[in-house]
Amino acid sequence: MKCSTFSFWFVCKIIFFFFSFNIQTSIANPRENFLKCFSQYIPNNATNLKLVYTQNNPLYMSVLNSTIHNLRFTSDTTPKPLVIVTPSHVSHIQGTILCSKKVGLQIRTRSGGHDSEGMSYISQVPFVIVDLRNMRSIKIDVHSQTAWVEAGATLGEVYYWVNEKNENLSLAAGYCPTVCAGGHFGGGGYGPLMRNYGLAADNIIDAHLVNVHGKVLDRKSMGEDLFWALRGGGAESFGIIVAWKIRLVAVPKSTMFSVKKIMEIHELVKLVNKWQNIAYKYDKDLLLMTHFITRNITDNQGKNKTAIHTYFSSVFLGGVDSLVDLMNKSFPELGIKKTDCRQLSWIDTIIFYSGVVNYDTDNFNKEILLDRSAGQNGAFKIKLDYVKKPIPESVFVQILEKLYEEDIGAGMYALYPYGGIMDEISESAIPFPHRAGILYELWYICSWEKQEDNEKHLNWIRNIYNFMTPYVSKNPRLAYLNYRDLDIGINDPKNPNNYTQARIWGEKYFGKNFDRLVKVKTLVDPNNFFRNEQSIPPLPRHRH
């Protein structure tokens, strides 16, 4: 009996040790366990090598860094993924989700890598990157004026191929040609046609999403609540976007100007004050923007000095004569002449405002829109405010003077007017709520080259943001998801389901729409698998 008891005890110990070892091995080797699981979704091992990159792969760092557009996040101390998956088929996305869940890894989804806080490729816990660079199909139907665009397609590629099909069609989307459709449409997406047709997200009519269960859903199968949430609510909180179906829009030739003003600040603020009071009131066919940056100049005495260069730039869906007449009647202080204006095709307008050509060039080669490496950035930080009433001239003097506190050319402000159709769209039409009552967006941007200068420049932009508190939107102070800013709040890392904590930043991005997003999240991802520092949390189970 004693022998039997001992034998039973010994066998139990062996079994316990065996299972403990396997559990510990599973925990200790999440990368290997993920790869073993993922191999089931890749029947050809040769193909697998082109889809999966681990830290042992000589191409790993090249793939990781290739679409990091903010060099703040390329240091040796920046957390790196255990695995990068570059799917070429939806089944690879399904496998990544299911295997990441199985072995306890988080997912970061990267389409173009333009997340200003690096959240599409950084996590503080072990993670996998799903890099959608190979999911870039664009299928255009000119007859119905729609297009299916996969998440990894760049805006430049979409503009290019739509123009190839019909030069009188385009899309209501952004300026930067290397931004990809996945994140841009999922976060809102403003651009030169915003006052005519709304945001990129306002023009989504269907979507393909892989959900937490690995199922591929379209608008019909996902339901209207989830479809609503994806369009401007940050699709990464709900699954992985495979493709958007977007509405294409009619575009005539456009007229543009970009005039530079160099003058004393007290004179300049009078122009700015005039702009504040009229830019949002213009007919929707005119977009009049302005931005400010410091440059070195030589004065009349031949001395070098630093001056603020102010640019007033337009996009007008009409002819030169009409624009000059309108500007001379409404804003004669700018002194716009015919010689300041250029009439361009819409595709050339996009090329100009993409920043890859000079204003006076006649060489608008649209092939540049296909260059996925164009316009690589240095280190930068962006913050944004929404302005609901004109800022006093005396305050704008102080705002502009603060540009001199930053390195020459490193700091910039930009003012982007609302109005037009944005006033007509309900704040609850999609999660993006910033509509009627907004005069303009005010961007604060700083950029630099050396990692060791990070704190210096971050302090400058945070100081100007704090200074602006009394003069911008409040209760809450509004923000824009596609200019993500972790300074405004993050989820509790110890309790990522904390609704109260998430509401701090959530209402700044989404206003009253935040609670509806939480309800959708609770229904479709109740265990909060798709999460990051600013992801929508589910409600606790007892509050469902």
UniProtKB/Swiss-Prot annotation:
Binds 1 FAD per subunit in a bicovalent manner. Expressed in young leaves. GO terms for biological process: cannabinoid biosynthetic process; terpenoid biosynthetic process. Inhibited by Hg(2+). Pathway: Secondary metabolite biosynthesis; terpenoid biosynthesis. The keyword Hydrolase does not apply. InterPro entries: BBE, FAD-bd_PCMH, FAD-bd_PCMH-like_sf, FAD-bd_PCMH_sub1, FAD-bd_PCMH_sub2, Oxid_FAD_bind_N. Keywords: Apoplast, Disulfide bond, FAD, Flavoprotein, Glycoprotein, Oxidoreductase, Secreted, Signal. Residues 1-28 form the signal peptide. It is found in: Secreted; Secreted, Extracellular space, Apoplast. PROSITE patterns: FAD_PCMH. Disulfide bonds join 37-99. PANTHER family: OS08G0158400 PROTEIN (PTHR32448). Belongs to the oxygen-dependent FAD-linked oxidoreductase family. Monomer. CBDA synthase might contribute to the self-defense of Cannabis plants by producing both CBDA and hydrogen peroxide, but since these reaction products are toxic to the plant itself, CBDA synthase is probably secreted from secretory cells into the storage cavity to avoid cellular damage. This is Cannabidiolic acid synthase. It comes from Cannabis sativa (Hemp). The lineage of its organism: Eukaryota, Viridiplantae, Streptophyta, Embryophyta, Tracheophyta.
